[in-house]
Swiss-Prot record:
Keywords: Cytoplasm, Membrane, mRNA transport, Nuclear pore complex, Nucleus, Protein transport, Translocation, Transport. InterPro entries: NTF2, NTF2-like_dom_sf, NTF2_dom, Nuclear_transport_factor_2_euk. GO terms for biological process: mRNA transport; nucleocytoplasmic transport; protein import into nucleus. The keyword Cell inner membrane does not apply. One of its GO terms (cellular component) is nuclear outer membrane. This is Nuclear transport factor 2. It comes from the Eukaryota. Residues 11-124 form the NTF2 domain. Its main location: cytoplasm. Coiled coil: none annotated. It is found in: Cytoplasm, Cytosol; Nucleus outer membrane; Nucleus, Nuclear pore complex; Nucleus inner membrane. Mediates the import of GDP-bound RAN from the cytoplasm into the nucleus which is essential for the function of RAN in cargo receptor-mediated nucleocytoplasmic transport. Thereby, plays indirectly a more general role in cargo receptor-mediated nucleocytoplasmic transport. Interacts with GDP-bound RAN in the cytosol, recruits it to the nuclear pore complex via its interaction with nucleoporins and promotes its nuclear import. One of its GO terms (molecular function) is structural constituent of nuclear pore. The lineage of its organism: Eukaryota, Amoebozoa, Evosea, Eumycetozoa, Dictyostelia.
Amino acid sequence: MQSVDPQVVGVGKQFVEHYYGIFDSNRAGLTQIYQQQTTLTWEGKFLSGADAIVKHIVELPFQQTNRKINSIDCQQTYQPGIMITVTGTLIIDGEAKNQLKFVQVFNLASNNGSFLLINDFFRLVLD
């Protein structure tokens, strides 16, 4: 049985750590991650382009977020790129009662030795 390339997993985990570090400390700083060609589907709402995406994220109705990551799965894609699926719990405004399970999928495309975020999907997992 083949396994996933450890380098792919390493890049994926580094991206996730970097992304959530910015999301949880300064959402407006996500302009350095999202591109003009990036698309985001956030809870069924489709957004395109860095400006629209970051505006939506900055305007979310909570101030502070932290998260507990349950799993990070990475897989190399055809381009070559990396598909990353994250599951976890989102903790809103530091409140134990405000914990929501989520899944997020990132699609990174290779670009001259680095990676660009091309697609992002975010969905809460409601019971």
